Each structure stands twice: as structure tokens, then as C-alpha cells.
């Protein structure tokens, strides 16, 4: 279909905001930091609304020699990551101010990371997908390392950089092998090539390296080594930069690679995803039980939740053939969005408890939170219930949708494993609730925070409950977006 260039205007808005914020930060210095912050937040919100409106358009548009695609799936994912970054900026403001880190480069790097995610979501070419990945990754490496006076931050940044560079090398090597075997970098052409008589051995090696790169970006076992150390070592605000929107973008990136380009090889990569998902569910849920550091606990929570996302990705295939793929992939998409919402709320409360000379890092810091602030204790309880998959929170329906897709794919044993390991994981989520409501507070100081942050945090908590009571609108939106994207494939 003819592609009107105005479809790219929200992406251009983000790029323009980066340029304006960069110029403002360069020429005004410390005096203009608040304006840089406002530019980042407003641009993210406006772009998010624009993307959400675009998601209603069922057509697919291609740009730049089919290197970029804009469809319902891309627009919806872009809206989610844009809103996610806006909320991340708001939650982080006071935390950064208290630590003298409220600087323009933090928000500029965040915006560059957002731009990379927008490219990842809309990539229709191996090179475009890789460039988006690198733009996001390099920005995140830098933002974690900004606090140079903290040894833990520097160590976390170094680990993330070294392992991230290794994963990027895997992806690039896999792309080179797939290009050599198919003669094309465009996803549609690769799809056609691998459907024919292409060198199976070369394709297999290429797929293995691609899957390894996807697993690293999602933080799936055994490529999860960086996740607990980076979550714990980085400042909490930077942890949210890494653990929020990038996870959603990584899911969309993986779906573009595996489904839009390599679906004919699904019988091969499904086996790899089964192993990754099973290991992630086991390691994430069981290891999280022994964690006393709240950020490290949430890191293992992220690992186990990415196991559920992988379940949705692999459940679209039955015995090597596409079977009800829209339901399976939409369940993974729904789960990724729900995970972002609950992660934002969880880290929002963690940062709310932090002060200038105090980091809320251990689970004991949540003791008696209900006595200090019943509202935010309730918000944290809702987030923990959602992560544990307890009704009526939206996390329950997210897990249920993925498990249903997994059973329909004939992988009942994997669904049973997911349920059993989730019961282990529920222990450390409910332990936080127990500490907040049944233990005496260690610190009686009042909970402080600006009005905007407190308001959005309450809305965040209410959204988790509201989506749990009425999940069908979001589920339907995910299903329609996936259907519109898959309509070009000969399923």
C-alpha cells in the first residue's frame, strides 16, 4: 500500500525532541535541566498518544525500501514503550534530584534508548533490527555508568556492556549466516527463502545465534547472568530504564525475527524456546526465594516472567505448523504489556521509599509500610499480587492466557511446570505483602514524593486492578494487532 510519510511523524517527533533537548542542555547547562526533563516527558506522552491512534489503522506501510514497517503491532508496541518511558521519567525525577543525577544526559540517553526501541519494533530488515538494538543497548550501557563515583554502578555497567557486546556479536553473526544462506536481509524475502530448499545446516546455526541474542535481551536462562547484578548494582532509576520498556521492545524484536522472518523454521527454534522458557521459569522462581535485596528479587522475577513471554512465542506452533498463532502471540504481547505496567509500579514504590541518604534495597525496608502509607502499601500489594498471578489483578489473566495457548499447542507438561514454579514464585511476592501489613516498621519517617509521582503511582495501581476486572479491551487490541501483522504471511 502507498505509504504516506505522515505515518512516521510520531517517530520524527521523538527525534526532534532529542535534538531540541540536546541543544537546550548544551547551551543552558544546569539552568535548563528541568526543561530537558519536560521535553522528554511531553514528547514521550504525545508520541505515545499518536502511536495509539495509529494502532487503529489495520493497514501495513513500508518505508525506505521496505526496511521499516508500520502496522498495528508496531504502533501499539511503540505506544506502550513511549508511555512506559514517560512514566519512568516521572518516577525517577525526585530520586535523581536527591542524588545529584538530575542531568540532561540522563534524559537524552533515555530518549535515545526510546528511539532505538521504536526502530526495533518497526524493523522489517535484519540491519534495521540490529541498528535499533544497538541504539537502545549503547544508550542503556551509558546511562547505567553515569554514576561514576559508585563502584557498584561501574561494575554493573561493565558487566552489562561486556555481555551485551557478546550478545550483539551473536546476533550479527547469526544475521550474516542467514544472509549467506538466503541472499536477503528483508524479513519477507528471508521467509520465502527459508521455505524453499536452502542450506539447512547454515540456517540452523544462524537461528541458534539469533535465539541466543533474543534470550540475552529478554534475560532468559542461561543468558541471564547480567540481570541480577545490573538490577542490584545500578541506581534504582537506571534499573527501571533497563527493566521496563526494553523488555517489551525485546519481545517485539524477537517476534519480528522469529515469526515474520523465520517462521518456516519454527520446529527448530520452538525447541530452543522450550528449553529457555523451562529453565527461566525454574531458575527465576526458585532462586528468587532466597533473595533479601528487593531489586535482586525483582530481577529474578523478571527472569521468570520472561519465561512466560517465551511460552507465548513458542505456543503458536504445533508439530512444526502454525496453529492458532494469533491467539498465542497475542497472549505473549498481552503478557509483555502487563509485565511493563507492574514493573513500573513496583519500582515506583521502591523509589518512593528512597531518600537522599537512604536506598530502599532490602525487603526489610518494606516492613510496616501499611502504617506509614496505607495507599502505597496497597499499590505495592497490587503489584505483588499481579506478578504472582493472583486474581482479580491483570497478572492472573496474563498468565491464564499464556497457559491456555501453551496447552492448545500440545505442551501441557510445560504449562504444568509453569504453574508449579509460579507457586514457588508466589512465596517471595507474598512475603513482601506480609512484611508490609504484619510487621512493625523499622523507620517511622513519612513517605515523601512530589504530587505528580504519587498521583501516577496510584493510577498505576488502579490500572492493574481495572485491567484485571475488565481485561477484554486490551486482550482484544493485542489480538487485532497480531492478526493485522500476520495477514501478510501464508499461514
Regions found by a protein language model. Give the residues of each.
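Alpha-helical transmembrane segments of multi-pass membrane proteins predominantly involved
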Residues: 1-491
Amino acid at each position: 500500500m502507498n505509504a504516506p510519510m505522515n505515518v512516521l511523524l510520531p517517530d520524527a517527533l521523538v527525534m526532534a525532541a532529542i535534538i531540541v533537548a540536546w541543544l537546550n542542555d548544551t547551551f543552558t547547562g544546569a539552568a535548563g535541566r528541568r526543561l530537558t526533563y519536560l521535553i522528554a516527558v511531553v514528547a514521550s506522552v504525545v508520541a505515545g498518544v499518536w502511536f495509539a491512534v495509529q494502532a487503529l489503522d489495520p493497514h501495513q506501510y513500508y518505508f525506505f525500501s521496505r526496511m521499516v514497517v508500520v502496522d498495528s503491532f508496531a504502533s501499539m508496541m511503540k505506544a506502550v514503550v513511549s508511555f512506559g518511558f514517560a512514566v519512568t521519567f516521572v518516577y525517577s525525577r525526585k530520586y535523581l534530584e536527591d542524588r545529584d543525577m538530575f542531568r540532561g544526559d540522563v534524559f537524552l540517553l533515555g530518549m535515545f534508548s526510546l528511539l532505538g526501541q521504536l526502530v526495533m519494533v518497526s524493523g522489517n530488515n535484519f540491519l534495521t533490527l540490529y541498528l535499533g538494538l544497538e541504539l537502545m543497548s549503547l544508550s542503556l550501557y551509558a546511562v547505567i555508568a553515569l554514576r561514576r563515583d559508585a563502584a557498584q554502578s561501574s561494575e554493573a555497567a561493565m558487566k552489562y556492556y561486556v555481555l551485551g557486546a557478546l550478545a550483539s556479536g551473536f546476533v550479527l553473526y547469526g544475521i550474516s549466516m542467514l544472509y549467506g544462506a538466503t541472499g536477503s536481509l528483508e524479513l519477507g524475502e528471508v521467509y520465502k527463502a527459508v521455505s524453499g530448499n536452502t542450506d539447512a545446516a547454515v540456517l540452523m546455526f544462524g537461528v541458534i545465534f539469533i535465539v541466543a541474542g533474543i534470550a540475552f535481551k529478554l534475560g532468559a536462562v542461561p543468558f541471564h547472568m547480567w540481570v541480577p547484578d545490573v538490577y542490584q548494582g545500578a541506581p534504582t532509576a537506571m534499573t527501571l530504564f533497563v527493566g521496563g520498556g526494553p523488555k517489551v521492545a525485546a519481545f517485539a524484536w524477537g517476534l519480528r525475527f522469529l515469526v515474520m522472518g523465520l517462521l518456516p523454521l519454527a520446529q527448530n527454534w520452538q525447541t530452543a524456546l522450550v528449553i529457555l522458557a523451562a529453565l527461566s521459569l525454574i531458575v527465576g522462581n526458585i532462586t528468587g526465594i532466597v533473595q533479601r535485596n528487593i531489586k535482586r528479587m525483582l530481577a529474578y522475577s523478571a527472569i521468570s516472567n520472561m519465561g512466560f513471554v517465551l511460552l507465548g512465542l513458542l505456543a503458536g506452533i504445533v508439530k512444526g505448523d502454525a496453529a492458532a498463532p494469533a491467539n498465542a502471540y497475542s497472549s505473549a504481547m498481552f503478557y509483555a504489556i502487563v509485565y511493563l505496567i507492574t514493573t513500573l509500579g513496583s519500582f515506583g514504590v521502591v523509589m518512593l521509599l528512597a531518600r537522599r541518604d537512604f536506598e530502599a534495597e532490602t525487603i526489610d525496608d518494606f516492613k510496616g509500610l501499611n502504617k506509614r502509607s496505607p495507599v502505597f502499601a496497597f499499590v505495592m500489594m497490587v503489584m505483588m499480587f499481579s506478578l504472582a498471578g493472583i486474581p482479580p489483578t491483570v497478572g492472573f489473566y496474563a498468565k491464564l492466557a499464556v497457559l491456555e495457548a501453551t496447552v492448545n499447542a500440545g505442551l501441557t507438561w510445560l504449562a504444568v511446570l509453569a504453574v508449579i514454579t509460579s507457586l514457588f514464585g508466589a512465596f517471595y511476592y507474598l512475603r513482601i505483602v506480609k512484611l508490609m501489613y504484619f510487621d512493625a516498621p523499622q523507620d517511622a519517617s513519612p513517605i515523601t514524593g512530589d504530587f505528580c509521582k504519587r498521583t501516577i503511582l496510584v493510577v498505576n495501581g488502579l490500572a492493574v486492578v481495572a485491567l484485571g476486572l475488565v481485561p477484554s479491551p486490551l486482550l482484544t487490541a493485542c489480538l487485532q494487532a497480531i492478526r493485522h501483522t500476520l495477514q501478510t504471511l501464508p499461514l
